[in-house]
Amino acid sequence: MDETAQNRHASPAPLSPVRSQTPDVAVRATAHRALAAFFAFGTFWGAWAALVPAVREAAGASNGELGLALLFLGVGSLPAMIATGAALDRLGARVVPITLLLMAAVGVLPALAHSVPHLAIAMLVVGAASGTADVAINAEIAGLEAATQRTLMPLAHALFSGGLIAGSIAAGLARQAGAGTAPLLACAAALIAASAYANRHPYPRVSHARPRRRIRRTLVAVGLVCALAFLIEGGIENWSALFLQRELGANAAVAALGPAAYALSMVVGRLSGQRLLPRQRSSRILTVGALVTLAALVATSAAHHPAVAIPGFAIAGAGVALAAPILFGAAGRGASDADRGTSMATVTTIGYLGFLAGPPLLGATAAAVGLRGSVLVLAAAAAVIAAAAPRLQLR
């Protein structure tokens, strides 16, 4: 390799996508185990989503009390994310199996709650454990991308989305057959425990470091755009069925197709990113995806029949599907081994504010102007993403 090529290889491009390169077999095996952790993590939360009504009933909580208890998920997760970033920088990937084991150990707690205060405490603990695992496995994938020079983040998030679907369906069917809430959550937690054991070996460190100063100037902006993407994700996931029922008069079965179509489109969109990201600029993909989401949500807000709204939610999901993988991957790859954990924690923590802000923001909008207005709020978030994407130094 001549000197020019060496310099070009060593020159750090901030927040840039990686190109395909055949990885070492051992590193590839490590990547497969890390990807399996995403599926296990998604399976747990899919099972949880299907079991929320049973958990609410066991705790004797009203809808309002359940909403308050669920708020403790975020209260616990955000500080835990920040702490995990520092731990990753200091201890490295050995933190990953510890966080997964912690999540597995506490995952069953919500099913054991028999009062609202107990449920709130359980959600606080589970939120903290989930936050640590979330940052750790995303940082692990980002580190593997740096080590292998391959795009992995879209596949990781696709597996998480696939796990959500699989866990929700499996838990729903098992619940219908008479299975208890605690055993079902314990089974989902056992998958996470198995992934913890599988991920007990850290990924190999990459040899070159990237300048921390250049990355820091972009992290907050990346996190804020991620928050808008998560606002859209959470909004469609949690409000699409309600929109179909209350605004369009759909029955419960038809209304359920809204979040289902959205979830499926997220999986397909993220899987497509495995081939698309190495071939196109990340900023262009993010911009075009946001514009697609914007158009789909505007059309959905004006829909008068579920046959229009359901595809609208699906197309919106496809448009936003690659936002989080692009932003998480860029933040992690743009950092050195010495500060990748903090970089991932910063973007993840800011990003998850979108999930927390979504329910009160969309709820207040729905109360003031109706659910069509809430969908337009999501469209506005997509417009901001489209405007901001070219300025994020993504390549």
Question: What residue ranges belong to the model's regions?
Answer:
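Short amphipathic helix-loop junctions that connect adjacent transmembrane helices
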Residues: 50-64, 238-254
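Interfacial helix-cap and linker-helix signal at transmembrane-aqueous boundaries
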Residues: 55-56, 87-88, 173-178, 244-245, ...
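Conserved MFS/SLC helix-loop-helix module at the cytosolic interface between two early adjacent transmembrane helices
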Residues: 79-111
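Helix-to-loop junctions at the C-terminal end of transmembrane segments
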Residues: 79-92, 175, 269-282, 366-367
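Structural signature of the two symmetry-related core transmembrane helices
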Residues: 95-108, 284-299, 376-379
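Helix-loop junctions at membrane interfaces in 12-TM secondary transporters
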Residues: 111-122, 302-311
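Intracellular juxtamembrane helix-capping segments at the cytosolic ends
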Residues: 132-146, 322-335
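Symmetry-related core transmembrane helices of the 12-TM Major Facilitator Superfamily/SLC fold
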Residues: 182-199, 373-391
